[in-house]
Every structure is written in structure tokens, then in C-alpha cells.
Amino acid sequence: MHPRFQTAFAQLADNLQSALAPILADHHFPAMLTAEQVSTLKNTAGLDEDALAFALLPLAAACARTDLSHFNVGAIARGVSGNWYFGANMEFLGATMQQTVHAEQSAISHAWLRGEKGLAAVTVNYTPCGHCRQFMNELNSGLDLRIHLPGRAPHTLRDYLPDAFGPKDLEIKTLLMDEQDHGFTLTGDTLTQAAITAANKSHMPYSHSPSGVALECKDGRIFTGSYAENAAFNPTLPPLQGALNLLSLNGYDYADIQRAILAEKGDAALIQWDATAATLKALGCHNIDRVLLG
């Protein structure tokens, strides 16, 4: 078990500990539960779906990287597939505050990058900030997405974001988590192809500036992130943050990164290179390359 989970795990009910122990045994537990695992945990612990999600929130919050605020937020995105995806807030010392990833963004990006097609609910241990409410409004679940908070009745995003502005106001039909493939040809080595594949998945209906990042760890593991734009622009999630989020959720540290590649168009309206390189260098990675999409 990764050390970050030990305190939260020790506070769980005994029957839930017994069911979770073999799942968490892997140091690189992927911070997600399959639909089958969720069903097993519910039956073993005698909890309904909502109660189980609340019980697991401390494990999600344990994944937070909060060197600046020391305020851990955890979230669980519940996919329409039945799979659950952990998320937690991330802060990057030496970079800018704008690079921060919020817990809801973390869980949603986690689900999206693992191929989830839509979300039924998000469970989070603190009220979503306005930034996250706007981020969630980009999803194909729209304002019907259920939001669950401890000690409160469940509400929809519509309740938390009245008079919402979103992609439909801009006549955008393809939403975040809808399947997309922009068709750029895969070239180069495995890491380069992974970055291009991530760029092909980008949600960028406003700038038409696709981008993707691939990070290679010293053990050969590769994590990718795709660009996710937002109708309100500022809640947009850059591709590097998506990749760093997956890397961290899987129990890796920034020091494990040995190489990074950004794939983007050289003539795009928005360029990720400077911000991507600056953030990676702040985290200790200097082996950074860029491949231009044709």
C-alpha cells in the first residue's frame, strides 16, 4: 500500500478495510475502482452507493499534492460505466498558481483520460468552487450531473450553477467526454505517438488548438494528458496537468519523470510550449521535447 493511504485506511470500518486491502496492496494502485469492485465493496461493507463514496473520500483526499495550501480536497467521479475515479487537488511549487488542478477537475480528467463516456455523479468533501462548477458544465452530462457533499442532500449541477453559461450558449455540440479523434497521423517513437494520440482526443472547440502531453517514467510507464477547453476559458485544463494528475494518482512522483513530449500545432492560436516547459522544469524535468502536429 502506498504510504499516503495508511492514515485514511486505518480509520475505515473493519469490513471495508478487509475488502479494500487487496485492492490497495499495489504501491501503484490506479486510484480507480471498477464497477465490479464497487459492487463487491458495497456488499461487503453493507453500504449503498452514496454511503460508500463518502466512506472512500478520505482515500481520494490522501492523493492531494498541496505543498502550498496544505488543504486536501478529494473527489470521486462516478462514471456511467459504473467505474469510480479518484481525484484530488494539486499545487506545483515553483510554478504559477494558475497551474493548480482542483479536485473535481482531477477526478473528471481522470475519468475522461481512462475512456469514460460520461458521469452520473461527483462526490466531493467540500463545496465545489465557482471554477469547478463552470468546469463541470462543459461535460456531456450537463446540468443534470449529481453532486454529493457530506451532510447535505444530493443536488444537481443546475442547483449549484443557476442561470448557467456554457457550451450550448456558443452553439457547441461536441462536449467534454464525447468521443473525439482529430485524426493526426502517429509518427515517431512510442512516447511521441502517445503525445499525438492524446492531442487527437483534445476538446478544443473554442480555439481549435489541439495539444497533448506524454510523460515517461524511469520504469517505462507512460502517462498522457489531453487539452480540455471550457466555454468560460479560464477553467480550461492544460494537457500537462492531465498527465501529471494521472501520474500522481498512480503513486508516482515528479522525480520519476525522465522524459516529456508535447504535441501541438506550430501555428495554433494558443501555444502550450512555454507554460508546459516552465512547469516541468520547476518540477525537475528538463528532458522536454515538442512535436508539431501536421
From Swiss-Prot:
EC supergroup of this enzyme: hydrolase
EC numbers on record: 3.5.4.5
Annotated binding of Zn(2+), by residue: 102, 129, 132
InterPro entries hit by this protein: APOBEC/CMP_deaminase_Zn-bd, CMP_dCMP_dom, Cyd/dCyd_deaminase_Zn-bd, Cyt/Deoxycyt_deaminase, Cyt_deam_dimer, Cytidine_deaminase-like, Cytidine_deaminase_bacteria
GO MF terms held by the record: cytidine deaminase activity; identical protein binding; zinc ion binding
Catalytic activity from the UniProt record: cytidine + H2O + H(+) = uridine + NH4(+); 2'-deoxycytidine + H2O + H(+) = 2'-deoxyuridine + NH4(+)
CDD domains registered for this protein in UniProt: cytidine_deaminase
Record key words, sorted: Hydrolase, Metal-binding, Zinc
Keyword check for Metal-binding: yes
A Pfam family it matches: dCMP_cyt_deam_2
Binding site for substrate: 89-91
This protein's GO CC annotations: cytosol
Ranges for domain CMP/dCMP-type deaminase: 48-168, 186-294
The record's free-text note on cofactor binding: Binds 1 zinc ion.
Gene3D superfamilies: Cytidine Deaminase, domain 2
Record's function text: This enzyme scavenges exogenous and endogenous cytidine and 2'-deoxycytidine for UMP synthesis.
Family to which the UniProt record says this protein belongs: Belongs to the cytidine and deoxycytidylate deaminase family.
Protein name: Cytidine deaminase
Provenance organism: Salmonella typhimurium (strain LT2 / SGSC1412 / ATCC 700720)
Lineage: Bacteria, Pseudomonadati, Pseudomonadota, Gammaproteobacteria, Enterobacterales
